Design a protein with these regions (language model features):
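Bacterial N-terminal signal peptides that target proteins for export
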Residues: 2-10
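C-terminal motif of bacterial Sec signal peptides marking the signal peptidase cleavage site
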Residues: 19-22
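Bacterial lipoprotein signal-peptidase II cleavage site
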Residues: 24-32
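N-terminal extension/subdomain marker
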Residues: 31-113
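Active-site catalytic motif of lipid deacylating hydrolases and related acyltransferases
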Residues: 50, 89-178, 305-349
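Loop/turn elements at helix/coil->beta-strand transitions in domains of secreted/extracellular proteins
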Residues: 80-82, 127-131, 176-179, 207-211
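Surface cap/lid and interfacial helix-loop subdomains adjacent to catalytic sites
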Residues: 162-176, 198-342, 346-349
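Gly/Ala-rich beta-loop-alpha elbow adjacent to hydrolase catalytic centers
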Residues: 184-188, 192
Length: 349
């Protein structure tokens, strides 16, 4: 059975089991913030905010990324000259109630939802690259949003647990000097902003081989770029070593609270790859940058009443956050190939 057929079967099983699991509560013993035992870490080592998270002691155990069970995809057949590392969006606490703020690495529901997301998002990179998809311990949406807003300095500590360990393993054992792409969505893109700011600055020998970073579904801001002069935002369809980022909304979301849209956000139009407010369409969906809000406006689809209700608290009723990738999947797939071709041409020996 070839790899693509295996992937299709895994995805089908994931969707079926997710429906069977439904909204059942994960059966595990959990601490509360009031009676939680003190973390093995001290406040001198980690931000005080982190020690208030339910389940933070899980990070006292390091994930072994030499174990293939901690990867959704860990390719053995390296058939392409470029790799992609993809970090999936929020998958923990999506299909049912959970008690901890932080997932276990082998949380069944998280893994099933992660596979479901990867089937539509990570597959965009599979045609042009060797695809690496690690499992990592996620936060619930509400706990991550609270941490970003109340203690953004905690993000670096959290990323240094699983994400940095995974990157260390990948670069030391898997990469073999190949160019690479970083890709994520939503929570995955949150961690990519930390990786780009911190890990890549500490590892310029890796960063110089980065074709692009697709930080989609979370804001890259002017302030972020100003404090990180080693980073550059994409300006064209094929510049390399750059960040590609956007958030998609309907026109009625302009005044709504959206947890992934930050002040000073920048978006690139995924149809014409411009930063201005020029209108573009591929005949099916459209895109235009709201340069004031820093988002892509799409008028080609509308959320159902049920979806509007589900999105209203954290994203706004007309957020198209769930469709950031799927709306422009063909354009993204071509763009990946275009940037790779430009990188390879620029780096010919």
């Amino acid at each position: 059975m070839d790899r693509r057929k295996r992937m299709q079967i895994i995805i089908l099983l994931a969707m079926v089991v997710t429906m069977l699991v439904g909204c059942g509560k994960i059966d595990k013993t959990s601490e509360t913030k009031e009676n939680k035992e003190e973390s093995l870490h001290t406040e001198n080592v980690v931000p005080a905010y982190v020690n208030e998270l339910i389940g933070i002691e899980k990070f006292d155990e390091k994930i072994d990324y030499s174990d293939s069970d901690n990867w959704m995809f860990l390719p053995e057949d390296i058939s392409k000259p470029v790799d992609t590392i993809y970090l999936y969006p929020s998958a923990y606490g999506i299909s049912g109630e959970v008690e901890d703020d932080i997932a276990d690495i082998d949380d069944v529901n998280m893994r099933l939802m992660a596979i479901y997301y990867a089937s539509s998002q990570a597959s965009i990179f599979e045609e042009s690259t060797n695809l690496y998809v690690p499992y990592y311990r996620q936060f619930t949406v509400n706990s991550l949003v609270d941490m970003i807003e109340e203690s953004p300095e905690s993000l670096q500590y959290i990323a240094s647990r699983d994400i940095y360990s995974m990157l260390d393993y990948y670069f030391e054992n898997c990469n073999d000097g190949r160019p690479f792409i970083l890709a994520g969505h939503s929570q995955g893109s949150v961690w990519l902003t930390v990786v780009l700011e911190d890990y890549m600055e500490e590892h310029p020998e890796y960063y110089e081989r980065m074709v692009a970073a697709y930080v989609i579904g979370y804001s890259v801001t002017d302030e972020y770029l100003e404090r990180n002069p080693h980073l550059n935002f994409a300006k064209t369809s094929d510049d390399t070593g750059v960040i590609v980022s956007y958030n998609t909304e309907g026109p009625g979301n302009s005044e709504a609270y959206n947890c992934v849209v930050k002040e000073g956000a920048i978006s690139i139009n995924p149809l014409n790859w411009k930063l201005d407010d020029s209108y573009a369409t591929n005949g099916v969906v459209d895109a235009k940058i709201d340069t004031k809000r820093g988002v892509v406006i799409c008028t080609s689809m509308e959320n159902t009443p049920e979806m509007k209700k589900a999105l209203s608290e954290y994203f706004g009723e007309e957020s198209l956050h769930l469709y950031d990738y799927s709306l422009y999947s063909k354009e993204l797939q071509k763009n990946v190939a275009d940037r790779i071709n430009k990188y390879m041409k620029d780096n010919e020996e």
